[in-house]
């Protein structure tokens, strides 16, 4: 743990790169940068008004959770990880992630603002942590890991759970609407945001892999399953805000969350505990995979031009055959 948390007083510049495994994550985040203004919300309101009341209720509360949870993630980054982690390459990633999480929060707020015309209801959703028990319970679990009384290793694993598991059921449910060709603005922003969160999850796993003093495997599995993670997400998406409301099968959703959790455990260097298969074949490309994943594929070919290219790719050549 010393390498990560000990201050590098002589590193005020990025180069030379001392952590070649960490730096590419910053470049990936930079390559995938987008803004809320790039999403076309124009047809969403018509689609939203055509939904039944159960579907509307589900979308409203999922967006309320997302809007609130991004604030918690931001707090965790700014108060804890950016301050504690001393690797310059990691600080670059965390700094960029803060900007990206702000964009996620803005996007969810715009969607709520676009869908909900009643001011009182809109304010209730914006203050979901205080007003909506299902959101409050989930947010409280995420928020408690900001507390410095937990070890750094515990908090980095818990943060991986927040970004890798606690969003998974909601992401999956929104892709259910994409499968039905509805809510194009919401579903496209969901593609971009789920890609970003997958990258953030993988980065948490990378930082954990660099720790000298890792947690016992059973403790990691407990954080993922019992202490929060899987059980919290199942409770939210299958009970408090059941995905049955939109026509999805809660049993299969539980299985999907277990599948995602197993992928995360493997990414953290631990054994699977559920051995569940992905029950939604249409989610194969967008589940939170570890190495070669959907986020490498880049949604809708969305990547900043040239950012991930190597220097040799920019060589001007006159003898190329056409």
Swiss-Prot record:
Fe cation 1 binds at residues 70, 101, 104. GO terms for biological process: deoxyribonucleotide biosynthetic process. PROSITE patterns: RIBORED_SMALL. Binds 2 iron ions per subunit. The active site is at residue 108. Fe cation 2 binds at residues 101, 163, 197, 200. Its EC number is 1.17.4.1. It comes from the Eukaryota. Keywords: Deoxyribonucleotide synthesis, Iron, Metal-binding, Oxidoreductase. It catalyses: a 2'-deoxyribonucleoside 5'-diphosphate + [thioredoxin]-disulfide + H2O = a ribonucleoside 5'-diphosphate + [thioredoxin]-dithiol. It is an enzyme of class 1 (oxidoreductase). Its cofactor is Fe cation. GO terms for molecular function: metal ion binding; ribonucleoside-diphosphate reductase activity, thioredoxin disulfide as acceptor. Provides the precursors necessary for DNA synthesis. Catalyzes the biosynthesis of deoxyribonucleotides from the corresponding ribonucleotides. Heterodimer of a large and a small subunit. Belongs to the ribonucleoside diphosphate reductase small chain family. This is Ribonucleoside-diphosphate reductase small subunit. It comes from Plasmodium falciparum (isolate FCR-3 / Gambia).
């Amino acid at each position: 743990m010393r390498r990560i948390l000990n201050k590098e007083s002589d590193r005020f510049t990025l180069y030379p790169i001392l952590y070649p495994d960490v730096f590419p994550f910053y470049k990936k985040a930079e390559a995938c940068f987008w803004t809320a203004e790039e999403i076309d919300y124009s047809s969403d309101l018509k689609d939203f008004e055509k939904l039944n009341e159960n579907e509307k209720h589900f979308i409203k509360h999922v967006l309320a959770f997302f809007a609130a949870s991004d604030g918690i993630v931001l707090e965790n980054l700014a108060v804890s990880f950016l301050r504690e982690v001393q690797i310059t390459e990691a600080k670059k990633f965390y700094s960029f992630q803060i900007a990206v999480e702000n964009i996620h929060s803005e996007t969810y707020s715009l969607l709520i603002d676009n869908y909900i015309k009643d001011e009182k209801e809109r304010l209730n959703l914006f203050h979901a942590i205080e007003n909506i028990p299902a959101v409050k319970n989930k947010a409280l679990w995420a928020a408690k890991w900001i507390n410095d009384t937990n070890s750094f290793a515990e908090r980095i694993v818990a943060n991986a759970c927040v970004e890798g598991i606690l969003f998974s059921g909601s992401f999956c449910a929104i892709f259910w609407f994409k499968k039905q060709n509805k809510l194009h603005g919401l579903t496209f922003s969901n593609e971009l945001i789920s890609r970003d969160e997958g990258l953030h999850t993988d980065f948490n796993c990378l930082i954990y892999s660099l720790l000298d003093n890792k947690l016992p495997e059973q403790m990691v599995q407990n954080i993922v399953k019992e202490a929060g993670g899987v059980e919290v997400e199942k409770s939210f998406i299958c009970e408090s805000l059941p995905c049955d409301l939109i026509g999805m099968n809660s049993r299969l959703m539980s299985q999907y969350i277990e599948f995602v959790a197993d992928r995360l455990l493997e990414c953290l260097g631990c054994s699977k505990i559920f051995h569940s298969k992905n029950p939604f074949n249409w989610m194969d490309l967008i589940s939170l995979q570890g190495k070669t994943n959907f986020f490498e594929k880049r949604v809708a070919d969305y990547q900043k031009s040239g950012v991930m290219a190597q220097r040799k790719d920019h060589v001007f050549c006159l003898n190329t055959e056409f």
